[in-house]
Amino acid sequence: MKWKTHKLITRAVCEALSIPNSEEVVESSVFPDQHNEFFVSNGKRVRIKHHSPFALKAAWRHILKARKLLLQGKDCSEDLGMALHYIQDYSVSVTRRFLFFRWRSEKVHDEREEELAELPVPRDAIEEGMKIRDPNQLKKALFSEKPEEELERIMYTATTLSAAAVATIFYPVGDGSGWRRAVALHIAAVASPLLLALIGGWLWLPLATVLGYAVHKLDFKYHRAKLERDWFRP
């Protein structure tokens, strides 16, 4: 997106939600275009491409950091603005389609961004995004995002998710009270495969370990409870 569009969406969302230091957030929403960020892949530092799935991971990382800073009474404007930048950029598809074929096109990308800069921010998208204030719902919505090709859909998606991110950081629902029950059930579930080793002998230990790890990864209730707990813990 053009800087004009980033700032337009970010300012509209921050004003609608009465966010403090809103202009600092607005200015930070263009930082990723000024300062490259990197992730590590196969031992190498690779620049985060704003229209790749790594942009969503970068956005989520900044969202988590912004929430922590807010809980600690510190300024979260920079991380919040950078998160919104990645969310907004990823909503723009950079591909062209013809029949069943699809390919990346810089020309299409540039044309879409030029035209987006002339669109108004959809107020109904802000209202829709404000309905999401649960961190687990935000995470699901964020990582379910798909790049859009139609201009109105791009603007709507970018605005909705931007509003959801801001609302969840500043006005979250929940309190993390289900954490203790979730962790108790999780420990019991992860430990249960060890019964194989106790009953069948130590030769079963490797399989029991693998099963325990699988149970840990697939215990979605535990991971949701953990995110909610962490959301309210400085």
Q: What is each residue range found by the language model?
A:
Residues 76-88:
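Short alpha-helix carrying the canonical HExxH Zn2+-binding catalytic motif
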Residues 173-226:
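Transmembrane alpha-helices
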Residues 88-95:
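Transmembrane alpha-helix/helix-exit interface in multi-pass inner-membrane proteins
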Residues 1-74, 78, 96-171, 186, ...:
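N-terminal, motif-rich segments that launch catalysis or mediate targeting to/interaction with membranes
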